[in-house]
Amino acid sequence: MEDTPERTPSSESIQPPGLAREPEVTSPGDSEGCARPLDPAPKKLCGYLSKFGGKGPIKGWKCRWFFYDERKCHLYYSRTAQDANPLDSIDLSSATFDCKADAEEEGTFEIKTPSRVITLKAATRQVMLYWLQQLQMKRWEFHNSPPALPATPAAALTENGPTLHLKLEQEEAELEEFLCPVKTPPGLVGTAAALQPVPAMPSALQNISLKHLGTEIQNTMYNIRGNKQAQATAHGPPVEESSQSAEPQRGEQPLISDPSIPEKEPEDPPKSAPRSCVPSGPMQKPKRQSNTFPFFSDGLARSRTAQEKVVALEQQVLMLTKELKSQKELVIILHKALEAAQQEKRASSAYLAATEDRDRLELVRHKVRQIAELNQRVEALEQDRERLVHEAGLREQQVQALQQHVQLLMDKNQAKQQVICKLSQKLTEDLAQPQPADATNGDFLSQQERLEHLKDDMEAYRTQNRFLNSEIHQVTKIWRKVAEKEKALLTKCAYLQARNCQVESKYLAGLRRLQEAAGAEPGDFPELLQQLVQEALQWEAGEASDSVGLSPVSEYDDYGFLTVPDYEVEDLKLLAKIQALEVRSHHLLALEAVERPLRDRWATLTELMPSAELKQLLRAGVPREHRPRVWRWLVHRRVQHLHSSGCYQELLARGRACEHPAARQIELDLNRTFPTNKHFTCPTSSFPDKLRRVLLAFSWQNPTIGYCQGLNRLAAIALLVLEDEESAFWCLVAIVETILPAEYYSKTLTASQVDQRVLQDLLSEKLPRLTAHLGQRHVDLSLITFNWFLVIFADSLISDILLRVWDAFLYEGTKVVFRYALAIFKYNEEAILRLQDSLEIYQYLRFFTKTICDSRKLTSIAFNDMNPFPMKQLRQLRAAHRERLEAELRELELLKAEYLERRASRGRAVPEGCVSEDEGEGDS
């Protein structure tokens, strides 16, 4: 047997197999193409490091004993390894690590937490890299570990060990560009480092922590008592007996073994320790040792066969425990369901058995009290939901901080890579230049020494670069795990709220049935029931309005439109989700860069007047809080010669007195209006009724048009922004009667057809490549663009861009519609040119407007790239195409009249053998 110190059981049993690996790599310089073997057993992460801290004259490096706690993911430190209580701890769960190649002292690295930055220094550079890699590994294991199971620690560790071992091996195979694992420095880390003498400091006072003076005093007193006990037992029984029977005195010290975890074989001693053969009798007594690190003989180690059997049995026990737990949960669920059914049956029987109204009223009051109790439970659940949402917000802030740190590390990495490239290029140039013949020997030696320094710097930067790559990769993985946990919390909130709504709806249905059954009888309880129903309805509406913000990417925007469109094609659903995320991203970026300055400018505009500044502000978009006021002013400018007080109410009165012929078509189109908007699909919403009244009033206002499909979308947009139905009515009047040309919504849609031909000419002028490409494939764009002009892009663009278009459209007129139509094609020109098949082009044109997310880019194209765009040219094109279209319509009317005249002249002759429809069945 070798005379080497044995490890304590805690150093082997705390970490599961396969988690802490000790690769056989000698130095960071051999990191390229290095092998990654694993040590047979994990080692405890502990050792002496220097910590920079203190204030005033005591500020400087202080030697501290660091040890890692896997349960909390904390790195504790104390003054010596024998101290009973740690001075402080560092939370590694949200920490990042950094090392600087150009540090003043070798082995310096940093641990950055959200609250502070801890600067540490290792004895050598290899020890520093070992600590950094091990801390990264421990942090990832903590974030990636599943929740604790109700079983013995040994069984849980044995079960999770092989799985994590395989995962880590797979990850290492994929990350060859990262820093290879560093070999364990012998005698400097692990439990063997505790046996080494404490590194000497310049003065004893410098190593004392004044910040934790109370803990220092406690540790000193404990060490004094421990030394006295060691001296008292020096003449007692042999060391091996006392070490085997002694109980650990400090359960909090992480180096003490856990008796519930089986002991493993002792690992190989450090290479630097001398080896000598000793007899198998009693062990030699060490010169000096602490009671924190007991020694065990090699005979206590169990065989691997017995260990494997124990592990297999523990795994089987854990599996049976899980199965028993699931069976118990199933029995509890079935028991609760049975109790609920029996309680409902008893309540129904009691209600039917009651002969008098008083008894039934008492039963109803009992149910009301139960509802009150349920409301209290709902409030408690709501508080829990708010707490979870708050925690999710804190997690999101933490994730943002980590992302910023990752970006900072990437910037540093890029800058250092540039430095490496410059140094390499300079080195190559220096080597390529021939040395002068008269160069002295001293110059050559200095240049050679400088070259060696540069090589060392390059190697240091290369090592730092690889470490930072691994740090960025691991922080990104941790961020993803945190995002998944946040999503799970939000899903849980939504589930609890859904269950709450189910309970409320169940009792609400019961109350409604009671109200219908007893509404005609005298008494006070019908009024009470009616009041309860109204309160429940109001509560349900309030809960529905509060549930919008549960998703990280909101399902609806500020005006109620779905941010994720409901496409029919399966592949387009993924595109829709991506588009929703892009919209959110552009919105957040615009909020910081553009929206806030724009809102400040709008806030200073107290009085609106036509001007060039107002024109530019409207093109940039009106903030949501100012949009209703601005739109009312724009509409009033358009219809002030038509507006009269009481006109809208008179039109509504006419509609109530007499049914309009278009009322049936309006009723049919109400359900087709924005089916993805929650304001028009919710059964309790008042928007459909408002829209019906606005469209009926317009039908009486303009009998020439009456009602045309498409007007419902225009009125709906006005309602969503202005919220007042009379203001929405006058907005519809302004669009149809003052902004758009006449006969835009006539039976023949003459003006709409003219605009389609004008758009084709403008496309040929502004986008000749796209026009030629579509012409070669016989693509008719009017099939797509006709609806754009008819409803001013409603249901085509996302709501944020759509309302920006309307902001400028209400002020400048139809020229804005042409500008944005051309800008949409310019925005997607390259994507359309890549499509070669006409069917693919039509499929793409059907939804490509929904893929536009960057409103600033689209606005810039519309009002900058499409210039010049004179209104005079637009009027001339409209006049020319209108003349041609009217000539074509007259020709069609002549052909129709000739056909009718020719048909009338021939008469309705019946061929022989055929029976006319005018003949009765009885005729022969």
From Swiss-Prot:
Modified residue annotations for Phosphoserine: S916
Region (Disordered): 1-38, 228-296
GO BP terms: positive regulation of GTPase activity
Matching SUPFAM superfamilies: PH domain-like (SSF50729), Ypt/Rab-GAP domain of gyp1p (SSF47923)
InterPro entries named among the record's database cross-references: PH-like_dom_sf (IPR011993), PH_domain (IPR001849), Rab-GAP-TBC_dom (IPR000195), Rab-GAP_TBC_sf (IPR035969), Rab_GAP_TBC_domain (IPR050302)
Region (Interaction with CADH1): 1-167
A Pfam family reported for this protein in Swiss-Prot or TrEMBL: RabGAP-TBC
Stretches the record annotates as Interaction with RAC1: 297-435
Segments of skewed composition (Basic and acidic residues): 261-270
Localization per record: Cytoplasm; Cytoplasmic vesicle; Cell junction
Residue ranges occupied by any PH domain in the UniProt entry: 42-140
GO molecular function: cadherin binding; GTPase activator activity
Keywords attached to this entry: Cell junction, Coiled coil, Cytoplasm, Cytoplasmic vesicle, GTPase activation, Phosphoprotein
Protein name: TBC1 domain family member 2A
Organism: Rattus norvegicus
Protein encoded by which gene: Tbc1d2
